UniProtKB/Swiss-Prot annotation:
The lineage of its organism: Bacteria, Pseudomonadati, Pseudomonadota, Gammaproteobacteria, Enterobacterales. It comes from the Bacteria. Residues 1-145 form the Ferritin-like diiron domain. One of its GO terms (biological process) is iron ion transport. Its EC number is 1.16.3.1. One of its GO terms (cellular component) is cytosol. This is Bacterioferritin. It is an enzyme of class 1 (oxidoreductase). It comes from Serratia marcescens.
């Protein structure tokens, strides 16, 4: 089915956001793991996989609309050097992605492409949950202090 060129452009922009998120969250996960912060590793790894699933959904929709998924224009990863910087980097990426999603949703609605709109609404719900989690973690860091927060992220290793 031939799709609207502008909706395909929106979907490709969102795909690009997801591709950056996959890599950024995966690297952050492995950095957390290396530091022994297994709870943060597990959460970041899970988020990376979720972003991969979102990317897959965008690719399928773009192909259905007879567009070409753009996997080449990768944005810049913003890799933090400490826990708080990493979470802030992830939050900035999620907030930018949510803004792009809202723009895409509004455009899809205006051209009556309800399937693309519903896809983006579904993904926006996931992104908002991640934003809420990141904001909560940053609030905990501010209230508890980074040392207490970091200590709470350590799980006993199973031998």
């Amino acid at each position: 089915m031939k799709g609207d060129k502008k909706i395909i452009a929106h979907l490709n922009k969102l795909l690009g956001n997801e591709l950056v998120a996959i890599n950024q969250y995966f690297l952050h996960a492995r950095m957390f793991k290396n530091w022994g912060l297994m709870r943060l590793n597990d959460k970041e790894y899970h988020e990376s996989i979720d972003e991969m699933k979102h990317a897959d959904r965008y690719i399928e929709r773009i192909l259905f609309l007879e567009g070409i998924p753009n996997l080449q224009d990768l944005g810049k990863l913003n890799i933090g050097e400490d826990i708080e910087e990493m979470l802030r980097s992830d939050l900035a990426l999620e907030l930018a992605g949510a803004k792009n999603l809202r723009e895409g949703i509004a455009y899809a609605d205006s051209i009556h492409d309800y399937v693309s709109r519903d896809l983006m609404i579904d993904i926006l719900a996931d992104e908002e949950e991640h934003i809420d989690w990141l904001e909560t973690e940053l609030d905990l860091i501010a209230r508890l202090g980074i040392q207490n927060y970091a200590q709470a992220q350590i799980l006993e290793r199973k031998e």
